[in-house]
Amino acid sequence: MAITRIGPNQSINLASNITGTLPTGNGGTGATSFAPGKVLQVQHQEITTTVETSSSSFTDTGFSLAITPASTSSKILCVVNLQSLGKAASTTSALSVRIVRTSTDIGRTTNMMYTLAGSTYQTASIVKLDSPSTTSATTYKVTFKNRESNAVHFNAYTGDTSTFTLYEIGA
């Protein structure tokens, strides 16, 4: 590639003098088309209140998102971020969290948090790639339970924000 130097008061017509693909200064590739794997849509939900359960059965957290895939070959990337997972002081707790598509369990943790007596707070994430094989609206939910039958919660502190995000990935 030839290099052209211009002085401070000179100009060059970029439209007629430059050919090929110019690199971008913002981290882009300069590509004009992309291979499969592009994010087609995003659905997002936030919860800012404390959510608690004492149940030993999976209970709704309040996270529920619907997404309508553009193709049966699309994948759905599910990302859950729970802030300030905690429990009552002086109890033993083991928290389990799962992601459910309609009525199908697509991913779970067995012991996202396991603690003995004393207050403990953690931040945790679950990431799951799902293949719903449909173009119909599909609902994903996040549920949780305490395996020790004691109270557990997330968003323990004012200002905590837990999130649930779905990304449709094109095939």
Label each PLM-derived region with a short phrase:
Residues 34-42, 72, 160:
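A short, polar/charged loop/turn motif at coil->beta-strand junctions and beta-hairpin connectors
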